[in-house]
């Protein structure tokens, strides 16, 4: 799918009636470049626009640099990247000007980033986990693609896919999107969950007979540091952009305790060592304080959830430069679903 086709699809899906309060249009492009509005060299270049350029006219623009939204701005795009951002000037428009998409009744802003997604499932799947055994490979791939498309259409141009029971489907979807054969955001994926048998990342639920558990979901299961190192390397060679360890129990897994550690510090260190050898980062699913501390000391780059961490562990993370991706909205969903 070409950039103009993507733009038209987005414009159609986001076409909202003009309101007194500007409706929100998210400028969602598969390749967004950074722009410094004070850079005059780009302004000069814009005077020599090419026929392949695309221009968007935005009623309001939130560019991430100015303290206030900018009024009536034009964004010039070339080869999928932002070339210039400047005030709209009617007198400069001519028959030779590149085509302009009029979004003067909308607000534009750069694409958003979601740091914690799982495209290979839906929220309602937690009501009956047997759906994971009943979906075919094609159905799972389509689910990933559908969720990716929905995510892009709501304004998120980059996502961090933090583990999957069906990592191969995510790899396939990422490839299709990169080849412009499907509509979706950039996907950085951790591949399979690296987890202990029966742990928070193991697809073991009463609804699924053991002999029907999809083998794809078992790619990251290990019991010792050496096994975790093997699984980590296999995930990277299969296409993982980074790695995800399930250091503690998980809220929606059966038979696990979110407040209890599952992987040992040695297990996590083994994964981190492999990741560093390949120039990859590691994130850790942690709820328990002990798991958070173990993961930090083992050398992970970030923590997911971090629900039960003590202040001292948070201070340790700050000292070690460990980032947090806490997805705090999950609390409301958990209270509702149980």
Predicted features along the sequence, with ranges:
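Histidine-rich, glycine-flanked metal-binding segment
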Residues: 37-52, 61, 65-109
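Short, acidic/polar
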Residues: 141-148, 224-234, 287-288
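N-terminal secretory signal peptides that target proteins for export/translocation
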Residues: 1-17
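Active-site core of metal-dependent hydrolases
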Residues: 197-198, 246-338
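C-terminal motif of bacterial Sec signal peptides marking the signal peptidase cleavage site
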Residues: 30-33
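Active-site mouth loops of central-metabolism enzymes
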Residues: 129-142, 212-229
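Metal-associated gating/positioning segment near the N- to mid-region
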Residues: 106-175, 179, 197, 266, ...
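Divalent metal-dependent hydrolysis catalytic cores, especially in the metallo-beta-lactamase
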Residues: 144-170, 183-193, 240-253, 281, ...
């Amino acid at each position: 799918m070409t950039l103009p086709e993507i733009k038209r699809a987005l414009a159609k899906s986001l076409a909202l009636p003009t309101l007194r309060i500007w409706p929100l249009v998210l400028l969602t492009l598969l390749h967004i470049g950074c722009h410094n509005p004070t850079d005059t060299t780009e302004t000069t270049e814009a005077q020599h626009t090419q026929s392949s350029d695309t221009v968007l006219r935005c009623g309001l623009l939130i560019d991430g640099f100015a303290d206030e939204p900018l009024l009536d701005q034009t964004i010039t795009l070339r080869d999928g990247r932002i070339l210039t951002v400047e005030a709209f000037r009617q007198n400069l428009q001519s028959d030779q000007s590149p085509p302009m998409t009029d979004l003067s009744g909308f607000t534009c802003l750069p694409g958003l980033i979601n740091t914690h997604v799982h495209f290979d499932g839906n929220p309602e799947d937690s009501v009956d986990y047997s759906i994971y055994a009943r979906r075919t490979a094609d159905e799972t791939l389509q689910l990933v693609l559908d969720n990716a498309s929905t995510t892009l259409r709501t304004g998120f141009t980059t996502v961090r896919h933090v583990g999957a029971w069906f990592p191969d489907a995510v790899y396939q979807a990422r490839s299709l999107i990169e080849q412009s054969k499907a509509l979706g955001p950039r996907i950085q994926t951790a591949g399979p969950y690296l987890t202990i048998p029966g742990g928070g990342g193991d697809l073991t639920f009463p609804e699924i007979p053991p002999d029907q558990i999809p083998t794809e979901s078992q790619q990251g299961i290990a019991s010792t540091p050496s096994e975790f190192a093997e699984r980590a390397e296999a995930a990277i060679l299969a296409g993982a952009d980074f790695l995800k360890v399930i250091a503690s129990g998980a809220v929606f897994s059966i038979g696990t305790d979110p407040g209890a550690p599952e992987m040992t510090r040695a297990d996590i260190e083994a994964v981190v060592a492999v990741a560093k050898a390949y120039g990859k980062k590691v994130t850790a699913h942690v709820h328990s304080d002990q798991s958070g501390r173990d993961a930090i000391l083992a050398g992970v780059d970030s923590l997911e959830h971090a629900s039960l961490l003590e202040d001292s562990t948070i201070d340790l993370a700050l000292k070690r430069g460990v980032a947090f991706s806490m997805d705090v909205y999950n609390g409301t969903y958990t209270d509702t679903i149980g």
